[in-house]
Amino acid sequence: MSKQLQARRLEGIDHNPWVEFTRLSKEYDVVNLGQGFPDFSPPDFAVQAFQQATTGNFMLNQYTSAFGYPPLTKILASFFGKLLGQEMDPLKNVLVTVGAYGALFTAFQALVDEGDEVIIIEPAFNCYEPMTMMAGGRPVFVSLRLSPAPKGQLGSSNDWQLDPTELASKFTPRTKILVLNTPNNPLGKVFSKKELELVAALCQQHDVLCFSDEVYQWLVYDGHQHISIASLPGMWERTLTIGSAGKSFSATGWKVGWVMGPDNIMKHLRTVHQNSIFHCPTQAQAAVAQCFEREQQHFGQPSSYFLQLPQAMGLNRDHMIQSLQSVGLKPLIPQGSYFLIADISDFKSSMPDLPGAMDEPYDTRFAKWMIKNKGLSAIPVSTFYSQPHHKDFDHYIRFCFVKDKATLQAMDKRLCSWKGEPQA
């Protein structure tokens, strides 16, 4: 065909590191600690809810309401309304989407116009930038700044902080949206109330919307508390809060997400949704509705999955932190999420010439080397930064610790073999 096939809005966003690292992980015999999914079963009540949805009411095989299965939007409005301090209308304040990815894409398409600026806090999940660009917006990046831990001590995700002056400098008359992710992927940073108040004050001062990606909100450790920015004074009316059933109930394949916010904003998302996806799978929504109804009854009690999951994953996190240190990796202790990052600076000094393209960041070459030579997969943290900042943050790799005990034991065996081998 003589005409250009690719739409201009796709220029510069065609490369996806997840595709490459998924392919490598399948080509080699690896323990997959790169991709963020549990390799253990969802809780029994969730499995039973899904089974019931597929074998019970035959009408669950048909379309449901376009903006969400009514029992699901009702329980989401009730459950999160209490947490956010809002009387939420299931029909006006909640939209069910194909995963949190779908919620984000719908929000960007609905609200970002040509030339609008979108502030993205780095490191950031790497869909925010291409979604901004596909909508015609211009991403504006601000990096969390690291205050190194004292020598001999492990660092923490809390060591990464916003510089208030730098953040304020990113706001211009063209700024439309700030994207917030707490707990943060890949750092595992849980933004404090003080940090959220800084973001909230700037959003209100400059009349900017906030997209708050909170898919890991139940996975917080060591007594840290997740705070939804929409719960702060003056923020409900300018915030879209995004959640994920897959992350909440360890069932990422269900692909059920949601977005919540004020009706005057949500109505534009409904316009995009009804002209693209229109309906999400009914049976998965029915299962998620049952799961939340169960959690509402048990919320705050030891029987709540939202308490049990972080307790179990906190142990996994501690196990991985101890194990990774045995080969010279330096993990940073995460406050939340599925992930931790590890500093590979010592390897960069002792093994600087790993195979790979000259323009490839060191952490990308290291992650590929580790897959091929050590049988362990992780994700280079430079992929969570904009192109100009890749080389500044090329000495970290991200591991997922939300894994089965057998997977962690397999990791230990690979690390034990690695420990007994020469580095190169």
From Swiss-Prot:
Principal location class: cytoplasm
Cofactor entry: pyridoxal 5'-phosphate
Record keywords, A-Z: Aminotransferase, Cytoplasm, Lyase, Pyridoxal phosphate, Transferase
UniProt-listed SUPFAM superfamilies: PLP-dependent transferases
Catalytic function, reaction form: L-kynurenine + 2-oxoglutarate = kynurenate + L-glutamate + H2O; 3-phenylpyruvate + L-glutamine = 2-oxoglutaramate + L-phenylalanine; an S-substituted L-cysteine + H2O = a thiol + pyruvate + NH4(+)
Subcellular location: Cytoplasm, Cytosol
EC number: 2.6.1.7, 4.4.1.13, 2.6.1.64
Binding site for substrate: G36, N185, R398
InterPro entries with a match to the protein in the record: Aminotransferase_I/II_large (IPR004839), Kynurenine-oxoglutarate_AT (IPR051326), PyrdxlP-dep_Trfase (IPR015424), PyrdxlP-dep_Trfase_major (IPR015421), PyrdxlP-dep_Trfase_small (IPR015422)
Pathway assignment: Amino-acid degradation; L-kynurenine degradation; kynurenate from L-kynurenine: step 1/2
Pfam families: Aminotran_1_2 (PF00155)
N6-(pyridoxal phosphate)lysine modified-residue sites: K247
GO biological process: one example: L-kynurenine catabolic process
Residues recorded as bearing N6-succinyllysine in the entry: K82, K413
Top-level lineage group: Eukaryota
GO cellular component, one term: cytosol
GO molecular function: cysteine-S-conjugate beta-lyase activity; glutamine-phenylpyruvate transaminase activity; kynurenine-oxoglutarate transaminase activity; protein homodimerization activity; pyridoxal phosphate binding
Quaternary structure and partners: Homodimer.
Annotated family: Belongs to the class-I pyridoxal-phosphate-dependent aminotransferase family.
Role according to the record: Catalyzes the irreversible transamination of the L-tryptophan metabolite L-kynurenine to form kynurenic acid (KA), an intermediate in the tryptophan catabolic pathway which is also a broad spectrum antagonist of the three ionotropic excitatory amino acid receptors among others. Metabolizes the cysteine conjugates of certain halogenated alkenes and alkanes to form reactive metabolites. Catalyzes the beta-elimination of S-conjugates and Se-conjugates of L-(seleno)cysteine, resulting in the cleavage of the C-S or C-Se bond.
Stated name of the protein: Kynurenine--oxoglutarate transaminase 1
Species for this entry: Mus musculus (Mouse)
